[in-house]
C-alpha cells in the first residue's frame, strides 16, 4: 500500500497520511482547518516498512477504515514530575 505523507503548517510534529496524493476528500473539514495547508513530505510504500514514530499496521488500518491517519507529536515530557519522583 502506497500513501502520501503531509506535514502540518499549524501544528509542529503533526503528519497526515492519505492513500492518494492530494486527495483530502476523506479528511473531515474541521481537521483540515486545524491542520492548516498540508505540505507534501513524501510518498511511501508501507509494505514491509517501519515508520519512526507510529506502528505501520495502525497506519494501514486507519487508512483502509477512515481514508486517512493523523500522527500527532508525543506529549511534552514533564521534567518537574520526573524530578519530584526522585
From Swiss-Prot:
Annotated YcgL domain residues: 1-84
Q: Which residues cross the membrane?
A: none
What InterPro entries does the entry give?
YcgL-like_sf, YcgL_dom
Coiled-coil spans are none
UniProt cross-references to SUPFAM superfamilies, sorted A to Z: YcgL-like
One Pfam annotation reads: YcgL
Its recorded name reads: YcgL domain-containing protein VF_1703
Amino acid at each position: 500500500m502506497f500513501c502520501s505523507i503531509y506535514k502540518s503548517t499549524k501544528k509542529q510534529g503533526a503528519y497526515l497520511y492519505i492513500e492518494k496524493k492530494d486527495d483530502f476528500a476523506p479528511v473531515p473539514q474541521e481537521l483540515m482547518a486545524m491542520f492548516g495547508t498540508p505540505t507534501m513530505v513524501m510518498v511511501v510504500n508501507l509494505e514491509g516498512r517501519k515508520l519512526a514514530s507510529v506502528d505501520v499496521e495502525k497506519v494501514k488500518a486507519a487508512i483502509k477504515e477512515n481514508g486517512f491517519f493523523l500522527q500527532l507529536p508525543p506529549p511534552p515530557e514533564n521534567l518537574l514530575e520526573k524530578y519530584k519522583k526522585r
